[in-house]
Amino acid sequence: FFFKQKTAYEIPKRDWSSDVCSSDLRLKTDNPGSTAFMQMRVDEALRAGRPMRLRQHWVPLDRMAPVLRQAVLVSEDAKFWDHDGLDYDELRISIQQDWARGRLFRGASTITQQLAKNLYLSASKTPTRKFAELLLTRRLEAELPKRRILELYLNLIEWGDGIWGADAAARAYFGVPASDVSAPQAALLAGAIINPRIYNPSRPSPYLLRR
């Protein structure tokens, strides 16, 4: 479908905290049809003079291949089940390296942090945006079970130009639903998350194969 309307989950600049509270409650049971990050990509496409066709097929976590879920956790957030949304060791290293460089560079984002960014924020690397991400991350962890956070993440993560979520990615790159992804396919899909608009799981680069 072609997406042009403003996403219901995009936070206005005024009084964003109350909007987050209400949307967090909806996220317990409702599957968002769009996110702020999706809207950002749509806006980029419109400015470039091309429509953005979004491909996304929402599937429950239990209908995603276990090897795919595990591959994403290993690649993106090995401590997911144990932390409270933030990996403090990685966060400390990130702050130290960013301070040395004089700018925000290193990601060190957990799955919950990435979900917070995708739902509500932009991709900009500014201290203000990063601070908002940390606050939103803690709120998501407080309001949602871990399995729901993982389900939301796997259905909303960007996996290529106009490709969102595990099922759309599995079908686009390998012609199978997320439930039928093999272990090698899962590894390639997980490895591409780091930069999904560059790395193509169906035509993996040497770097992606190493990941």
Enumerate the predicted regions with their spans:
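Juxtamembrane regions of bacterial inner-membrane/periplasmic proteins
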Residues: S17-R211
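Single conserved hydrophobic/aromatic residue that forms the stacking wall/gate
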Residues: F1-V20
